[in-house]
Amino acid sequence: VHQLVSTVRGHRRKEVPPAACVAAAFPPGSMTGAPKFRTVEIIDTLEPGPRGVYSGGVGYMSVGDGRNEAGGFDFNVVIRTAVVKPGSGEVWLGSGGAITALSDPVGEWEEMTLKARAVLRAIRACDEAA
């Protein structure tokens, strides 16, 4: 499994709200494929509903001190994350791969399950400890 880590830096135009910058970045092209907007349209027709936090972002925004510090934000892409549905005993785990016309379905399945394995082990350990 190859993992991508990127640091993206830039300067926001004053007329663009900080939240608009974050909204434009998610879901990232590394999760959707390219061209991003068309791919998101296709995903919306194929998947039964929204992905929730999976492929979204978790992070923070700071406003700065208004003089020298401009503020900023730092977000990560949510992958291999377990989401617990309160009171139900259900846990949801998103995992995926980059499927292309040349993909091998068995290989993609194996990659997806490999990516999910560590989180599944943690869930099982919690279940056994309960």
Each PLM stretch: what is its role?
Residues 1-130:
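Conserved hydrophobic core element of enzyme catalytic domains
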